[in-house]
Amino acid sequence: MLDFDRVLLSFYQLSNCKNDKTDEVETLVKEAMKAVESALDGNRIVGEDIYACEYAAACTAVYDYVCREAFREQNAVTVSGSADINGNFSHRIDAARELKKQAMSRIEGLMPGGGFMFETM
């Protein structure tokens, strides 16, 4: 239902992710698309609704990407073997969470139950 190329393009525009993580990014985007599609009632989608759904999938992928990157950066091990956990990534995660929340709220009318199930995920 959702167009992979449009979701992927939106992901790159939102995340500033470099193209060197293509396989990982494509997997994140596909997983986000699957999650959004499974939460939607396809019979409720009309006209331009699909673009809002694709944007929500991109925002979901951005949130997942930001969480993974924060985890990697916080747990990076230096050459000497000591962990470098000096970075504060909570602001990035909070911003990505808010972006996802706003995008999902735009399409909650297309979900059975008004989006409650997705909010708990």
Specify the residue positions occupied by each region the protein language model found.
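Conserved short "hinge" loops at termini or chain/domain junctions
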Residues: 1-53, 101-121
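Homeobox/homeodomain signature
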Residues: 26, 55-56, 89, 97
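Short amphipathic alpha-helical patches
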Residues: 34-38, 59, 84-85
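Short loop/turn elements at secondary-structure junctions
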Residues: 63-121
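Mature extracytoplasmic domains of secretory-pathway proteins
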Residues: 50-59, 63, 67-68
